[in-house]
Amino acid sequence: MDLSSNSKLSRLIGCHLISLAWKCLALVIMVLFLRPVLLHLFSGCGVIEWNNQDLILSHSLLLSSNDEGVRREKFLEVPQIVWGLNNQKIAFARACLTARMLNRTLLIPSLSASLFYKEIDQLQPISFDKVFQFDKFNSLCNGFVRLGRYLDLKNQTGIYDLQKGSGRKWTVERDKEQLKQSSRGHVDEHEVIRIVGKNPFLWHDHWPVKEYARVFECLVFVDEILKEADKVVSKIRHIGRKLRSKTVTVQSDLNADTEDSSKAAAPFIAVHMRVEIDWMIHCKKLEQRSGINQICSSKQEIMQRVGNIVSSESPTVVYLAVADSLLNDSSILRGWMKGLLPFEKKKLRVDGIYKRHPYLIRSAIDYMVCSMADIFVGNSYSTFSSLVVLERTLKMTRMGIRNSCGIDVRWPSYAYNIPGESNGPQKWMTNMSDSSLQAISYGSNAISC
């Protein structure tokens, strides 16, 4: 009797355990099935919470989403985008974000190959896809913003001209309300909304830095520009290796274990040296209006502060990104501290690369050279410098670096117009939490590492 009872009990327990095992297996399968679905749902946010901080995802995850939110049959047209490369990038991004607010595809805008305020009679339009990769942009910004071509138009419902307001009475709130109203009703029924008036750089700003950064990350220069920039960087590093190899050769006489000179690293510093005539006039007026004396920097101040960034033990090439045509001072190559070897385009013998391109392309090449430099030093009131620092900040952020204070980091940037530690320039990272692009568009002395 006892044996029979024990046998029944064993079978009962065995059945229960088997049932429990199947339930556990089913639960595991359910979790594995639902996991990618849940991850997909939450990845659309672009940012997840981790230890109460915003964790900015990698480039591929940040921009991965579907394209359902951007209408392909409704378009926004904007005025020709003008001024320098930096202003045109901001104007383009603002046009993209305006199109996003209206849930429309932005018709590919015309850029300007020449400086508007310097060459009014010689303004040269240049197609967007002569500067940036069109298909690459739509691929990287898929689901966020979208570019379209005029060939996509069906011309069924005509064009609605939207006049942008101006003057003091045209406030940020009024501008935003106009855009909201244009996203619905009879205005939205038109195939194309054409904004008339000021160029997009001068429009009111309604978006945080992070949204601009998403657009900037999608802007990839065409291969021709990237190759030209690679040629300049290769020349800089080649000269750096030659100069360092001489130092290594001298040292090798004293130390037989010295590493082969052919393997010597050749880091370089890029300095966006704003000492041109037009800049000095502009910054002096800006200092007078604002009461801030940390905008202009003399070449002596720049040389001294840059010289306090690195040691003078090994020779380091300093590439001077300067608008040669606007420069009225050939002495920028003299007076640098020991160990710093300055080169501008002519001394580097790459001026021929720049001369065969219009102003916008020349600026794009310099932008890439500054972005690829091991150390970048610029002016915090220069939009060009600010956009270079933003790109370098994004590189560091993707590496998990959130600040550069007191530590050695990859892609460090500095502002020479603001004093930092040890009489050097102030370390500089873009504040990705800013609610607008004001500091980048117009400059600021409130920067930090």
Say what each PLM segment does.
Residues 2-449:
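N-terminal targeting/anchoring "stem" of glycan-biosynthesis enzymes
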